[in-house]
UniProtKB/Swiss-Prot annotation:
Function statement: Plays a central role in 2-thiolation of mcm(5)S(2)U at tRNA wobble positions of cytosolic tRNA(Lys), tRNA(Glu) and tRNA(Gln). Also essential during biosynthesis of the molybdenum cofactor. Acts by mediating the C-terminal thiocarboxylation of sulfur carriers URM1 and MOCS2A. Its N-terminus first activates URM1 and MOCS2A as acyl-adenylates (-COAMP), then the persulfide sulfur on the catalytic cysteine is transferred to URM1 and MOCS2A to form thiocarboxylation (-COSH) of their C-terminus.
Positions that bind ATP: G80, D101, T108, N109, L110, H111, R112, K125, D169, N170
Superkingdom of source: Eukaryota
UniProt cross-references to SMART domains, sorted A to Z: RHOD (SM00450)
EC number: 2.7.7.80, 2.8.1.11
Source organism phylogeny: Eukaryota, Metazoa, Ecdysozoa, Arthropoda, Hexapoda
Active site, UniProt feature: C227, C392
Stated name of the protein: Adenylyltransferase and sulfurtransferase MOCS3
Cofactor entry: Zn(2+)
Compartment list: Cytoplasm, Cytosol
A GO-annotated cellular component: cytosol
UniProt cross-references to SUPFAM superfamilies, sorted A to Z: Activating enzymes of the ubiquitin-like proteins
Amino acid sequence: MEGDTEIAELESDIRTLRKQLKEKVQQLKTLKKHFQKNCITKLNNNEIARYSRQIILSEIGVQGQLKLKRASVLVVGAGGLGCPSSLYLAGAGVGHIGILDYDEVELTNLHRQLLHTESTVGLTKVDSARDYLQELNSQIEVSTHHTQLTSDNALTILEQYDIVVDATDNVATRYLLNDACVLLKKPLVSGSALQLEGQLTVYNHKSGPCYRCLFPNPPPPETVTNCGDGGVLGAITGVIGALQALETIKIILGNDGVLSGRLLLFDGHQSSFRNLKLRGKKADCVACSDNPSLTKLIDYEQFCSMKATDKDSHLDLLSPEERITVQEYKSIVDSKQRHVLVDVRGANQFEICQLPCSVNVPIEDILKNRRGVTDILGSSESDDEVAVFVVCRRGNDSQLAVRHLAPLFKERGLPTPRDIVGGLHAWTRNVDKEFPIY
C-alpha cells in the first residue's frame, strides 16, 4: 500500500540520518577533547554563563566548577534512577559521564525514564540517553557502554571513572558493583526505588562501610521484588535519582554531609524523609576490611542464585509435575474439563485483565493464611477430581502459591494445585496475542 511505502521510506531516512548524526557527534567529541586538554584549568565564557547560578554558591565557586569539569562519573543503568541522576550530572557540568546499560527502550519505560521518548523506543538506552544529554549540554563528554556488566568487564570499565552511581534494579549487580568499587577504591552512590518508596546511601567513601558490611549474604531469590513486579511511581525514581546526583556532586566537590554511613529513606505516601545511621565498617568484612578474603571478582549470579539483569526474574521452585504450559492449559479449557483457575495477582492488577472464569485470590492472602482451600474450591471441594491451576503475571508468584497450598490440599486428600508456567505473559506470547500485556 502507498502508506506503507511512505512509512518505510521515512524509517529508512531516519536510520540514515541517525547514522550521520552519530558520526558528526563523534567528530565533535574528538575536537572537544583536543581543546579541553588545553583549558582544563579555566572556565570559558560559555561555561561561566551556563553554570553561573551554581558558581555563585559559596559551596561551589569557580574552583568547584573546575572540579566538576575534571570529574568523571559512571552511571550504571539508564532507567528510572539513571535517567534523572545523569540528567542532573550533565546539567551541573560533570565533564565526563559514562552510561552503561544492556537494554533497549520500551514503551513501559517512558513513565519514569524521562531521557527516553516515544521516538527512541527500540533504540539502545545508552544511545537514547547520550543523545538527550548531549542535546542538553554539548560541552561535556558522554561515553556509552552497551553491555551487561560482568565480572569480566567490570574492572576495565569502572577504572575509567572517579565515581560510580548504582542505578540498577537487581541484587547480583549490587554485589558486583560494590566489590569492584572496593577493589578500585572508588565511592559507590547507591539508590533504589519501589512502589512509592525509595532509599539512598553512599558506600565505600572514606571510612564508611561498603555494601557487604551491611549485607554479607544475599537474600533468597523468592523474597526479591523489582519494579517490574512490584511497580513504581515515576516521581519516586525522579526523587531518588536526583538525590544520587546531589551526593555525587558533593563527593566531587569534597563537601561535608555525604550520605556515607547513613541511609536516607523516602516515603512517597507521606512525602517524608528519614535519615538513619548505619552500622560502621565491619572489621571482618570480606571485601573492605584490612585483611579481605575477597581479592577478585566472583560469579555473582551463582553467589546470589539470580540473574544479574534488571529483566524479569524467573523462579524455578517446583517440579515439572507441579506445572503445566499455557498450551496445555488452553487444551483443558477447549475440552471443557472441569477445573478452577486461581489468579494470585493483586486486585488492582486483576482489574486490568483476567482469563475467563478465573478466581482472584491474592498471593498475600494465601501466604498469610487469610484465604485457603475453601476460598479457592468453594462448592467444588466435595469433588476430589477437580483440578486447580494457579496463574499470575509472569509465573513467579504462582509458584510461591502452589508451594504454600500443596500441603494444605494434601491434608484434605485433594489433588495438588499446578502452576501455569510463564503466567499471563506466556499466555499472550503463545496463545492469545490480543490478551493485554503490562
